[in-house]
Each structure stands twice: as C-alpha cells, then as structure tokens.
C-alpha cells in the first residue's frame, strides 16, 4: 500500500514533488512561448495547495518534451512556473538548473508555504539513463535537498526514471492527491 499525502509530516519540510507538467506549447505572434492546454498544471494544484497549507516548502520536479539530456531553451519550465504562479495566486520561484547550485539556492530560499520549480529534469541525461546507478546518482543529489518525496505525476508514475523511482527509494514518500484520485478510479474498473 502506498502512503497517502495525509500520512506525511510536511510542516517546515522541503517536499520534492514530482508533477506531470508535460503540456503542449506554441508561440504567439511575438515569438513568446505559450501553453495551449494547462490541464496538467491545474491538476497538480490541489496537491500543491494541500502541502503549502500544511507549511511545506514545495520544490517541483517535472519534465517538458524530450530534450534528450540537453538544455533546450524552448522546453524550459519557466512558462509553466509562470502559469502555476497565476493558478496558485502566489509567486513561484524558478531554478536555472536541474540539481546544481541554482536548484540548491532556490530550495534553500523557500519559506514555509512557498513553491519553487526546478528546471526540466530531462535536461540532465541521468534522469532517463538506462543505468540505475546513474539515475540514483541524480536522485541522491535531489534527496540531499529535500526531506520527503511526493509523487503526483500520474502520467509518469510508470517510468523508470530518477525523479520517479530512484527518488522515492531515498526519502519518505507518498502519493499526491492526483495519483490517489487516479488510482481510485482505476480500482473501480472491472476488466
């Protein structure tokens, strides 16, 4: 049985939240990146609010597209963080890297109830490495910056990736509200 969000003590702790922010993008007339469907972002808001309402410091891990281990500017999570800020009605900090100095400083700067988005996890080739030791190396860097892990990216829970499987093995963890909801719906299906 997977632990539930309500089972975790998160007050004053850094919660590393794996979300599914792989949203469709386009460009507007000025060439700026726009999100054409924000449903995946909106679907994580209840979990984020549940955490911030309980005094957690939320650092979000997510991917966008398939950058294949390289930094691809058009696949940055900055537009996603901006939309999330609008939905939450509060500022959302954005790290300039996946797990380096900017991520560490951004997480360290959070106060209780604040939210940050780390840069696209797939900018780091270790995220999707076939070698579990390589994935664990990346997950260990994240784990050093957090206290607990919450999996709320239902669209990625089946993936064998550093921010999904290896990170959960390193920290106390639970399913987010979206994953709980989807698991419940699946339990109602009789095949």
What are these regions (language model features)?
Residues 1-189:
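Active-site loop-to-helix "anion-binding N-cap" substructures in soluble metabolic enzymes
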């Amino acid at each position: 049985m997977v632990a539930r969000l309500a089972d975790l003590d998160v007050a004053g702790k850094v919660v590393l939240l794996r979300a599914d922010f792989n949203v469709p993008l386009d460009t507007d007339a000025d060439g700026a990146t726009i999100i054409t469907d924000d449903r995946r972002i909106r679907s994580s808001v209840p979990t984020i609010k549940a955490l911030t309402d309980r005094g957690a410091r939320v650092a979000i891990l997510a991917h966008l597209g398939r950058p294949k281990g390289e930094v691809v500017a058009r696949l940055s999570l900055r537009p996603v963080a901006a939309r999330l800020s609008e939905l939450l009605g509060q500022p959302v900090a954005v790290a300039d890297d996946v797990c380096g100095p900017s991520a560490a400083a951004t997480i360290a700067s959070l106060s209780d109830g604040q939210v940050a988005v780390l840069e696209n996890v797939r900018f780091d080739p270790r995220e999707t490495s076939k070698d579990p030791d390589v994935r664990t190396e990346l997950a260990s860097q994240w784990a050093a910056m957090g206290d607990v892990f919450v999996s709320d990216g239902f669209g990625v829970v089946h993936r064998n990736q550093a921010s999904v499987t290896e990170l959960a093995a390193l920290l106390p963890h639970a399913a987010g509200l979206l994953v709980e909801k989807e698991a419940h719906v699946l339990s109602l299906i009789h095949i």
